[in-house]
Regions:
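Intrinsically disordered, low-complexity and often Lys/Arg-enriched segments
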Residues: 1-3, 70-71
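A short, structured beta-strand/loop element
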Residues: 2-42
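Long, charge-rich, low-complexity alpha-helical segments
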Residues: 25-71
């Protein structure tokens, strides 16, 4: 999945916050919920529009970004 398939930003949607593409769910919800102790299954239960494939792709993209930053 390409980043544009996972997240997008549009000034008309959630005041331009980074959201999961095709939703109004901010990407921060995923990371803040994980940091708060929620499991991925719990997050997807609360925000089913994210979808498992997109959530896992977001985590992989974040991981790659960290590896690139550390290189």
């Amino acid at each position: 999945m390409q980043p544009g398939d996972v997240f997008s930003r549009d000034p008309e949607i959630m005041s331009g916050a980074l959201v999961f593409t095709g939703t109004r769910v901010p990407v921060d919800v995923l990371f803040e919920s994980l940091l708060g102790g929620s499991s991925l299954d719990e997050i997807l239960e609360d925000f089913p529009s994210i979808g498992r494939e997109r959530a896992e792709a977001a985590l992989r993209l974040a991981q790659r970004s960290l590896h690139s930053a550390a290189a």
